[in-house]
A protein has these predicted regions:
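Catalytic donor/gating beta->alpha subdomain of glycosyltransferases that bind UDP-sugars
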Residues: 67, 72, 76-133
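Membrane-embedded multi-pass helical conduit in multi-pass membrane proteins
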Residues: 146-220
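Short, P/G- and charge-enriched loop/turn segments at secondary-structure junctions
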Residues: 38-44
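Basic/Trp-rich segment in TM-proximal cytosolic loops or flexible interdomain/linker regions
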Residues: 103, 107-166, 190-196
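Conserved nucleotide-sugar donor-binding
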Residues: 49-64
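Hydrophobic/aromatic residue at the end of a short beta strand that borders the catalytic acidic motif
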Residues: 1-4, 28, 55, 76, ...
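Conserved donor NDP-sugar-binding/catalytic core segment of glycosyltransferases
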Residues: 1-36, 90, 95-98, 102
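Alpha-helical elements of Rossmann-like donor-binding domains used by nucleotide-donor carbohydrate transfer enzymes
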Residues: 6-10, 79-83, 120-123, 209, ...
C-alpha cells in the first residue's frame, strides 16, 4: 500500500477534539468488475480498515490489544470495529486521507482457496453475536446447507438403490447449484475463463463452505451456522 500525498495532513485535519478513531479511505488505482471470489466471502466492506486507521492511545489502551486469533482477511478489521462500537468510541472519517492499494490478479479458483477464512466467522460470531447478525449475515446461509442436503439425499438414494430418491436429490442439487451460479455471475466479470471458474467453483463451494463453518464451530466451541 502507498499513502497518497497529504495523507497524514488530511488525517490530522479531520481528527477533532471529540474524535476517538479516524478512518481514511483505501482506493484501488485500477478498479475493475469484481471477480466472484471477491464477493463470496459473505461480508460487506469493512467499515474500519486497520491499514488506514488512526486511533488515540487511550482508546488502544482501553482495547487492551488485539485478538491474534483473527489472522484472515478483514475479520480483524470487523472485530476491531465491533469492539469500538461496544465501547461507544466516536468514529470519524476522512475520505481525503487516502491510501492506494493495488489489486493483484486473482488466480483461477480463488473462491475455493479463500473459503478456509469462513472458520474465523465462528469466532467473530461467538464474541459479537448480535453485531454479527446485524452487520455481517442476518441469517445462516441456508442455500449452502440445502445444496449439501441435496447431495446427501442423492448419495443415500444411490447407496440404497432407490432411484427415485437419487433423482430427487440430484435434481434438487442441479437446480440449487444453477441458482447459485446465476447469482454469482450477476454483476461479475464475464470473460470465458471467469465463467468457467464460476461453473466449477459453484459446485464445490457449498460443501466446502459448510465444512469450514463446522470446523470453526468445533474449534471455537460455539453453535454457529
Amino acid at each position: 500500500m502507498v499513502a497518497s500525498p497529504g495523507w497524514l495532513t488530511q488525517a490530522m485535519a479531520g481528527f477533532g477534539d471529540q474524535t476517538d478513531v479516524l478512518c481514511g479511505r483505501i482506493e484501488s488505482p485500477h478498479r475493475r468488475v469484481p471477480a466472484a471470489h471477491e464477493r463470496d466471502a459473505g461480508a460487506p466492506d469493512p467499515e474500519i480498515l486497520v491499514t488506514n486507521c488512526f486511533c488515540r492511545r487511550a482508546v488502544l489502551d482501553a482495547l487492551d490489544g488485539f485478538d491474534e486469533r483473527f489472522c484472515a482477511g478483514w475479520r480483524e478489521d470487523i472485530e476491531l470495529h465491533f469492539r469500538l462500537l461496544k465501547m461507544q468510541a466516536n468514529i470519524a472519517r476522512s475520505p481525503l486521507a487516502t491510501v492506494i492499494h493495488p489489486e493483484p490478479p486473482a488466480r483461477w479458483g480463488a473462491s475455493l482457496f479463500e473459503l478456509h477464512k469462513i472458520s474465523f466467522d465462528a469466532l467473530l460470531y461467538k464474541k459479537h453475536p448480535e453485531l454479527y447478525r446485524q452487520k455481517i449475515r442476518r441469517l445462516p446461509c441456508w442455500e449452502e446447507y440445502a445444496i449439501v442436503a441435496a447431495i446427501v439425499i442423492a448419495v443415500l438414494g444411490l447407496v440404497a438403490g432407490n432411484e427415485v430418491v437419487a433423482v430427487i436429490g440430484c435434481g434438487a442439487w442441479l437446480v440449487l447449484t444453477a441458482m447459485l451460479c446465476i447469482r454469482r455471475l450477476d454483476g461479475a466479470a464475464h470473460s470465458a475463463v471467469h465463467i468457467a471458474d464460476i461453473l466449477v467453483t459453484s459446485a464445490l463451494i457449498p460443501p466446502a463452505a459448510v465444512f469450514w463453518r463446522v470446523i470453526g464451530a468445533i474449534r471455537y466451541r460455539v453453535r454457529f451456522a
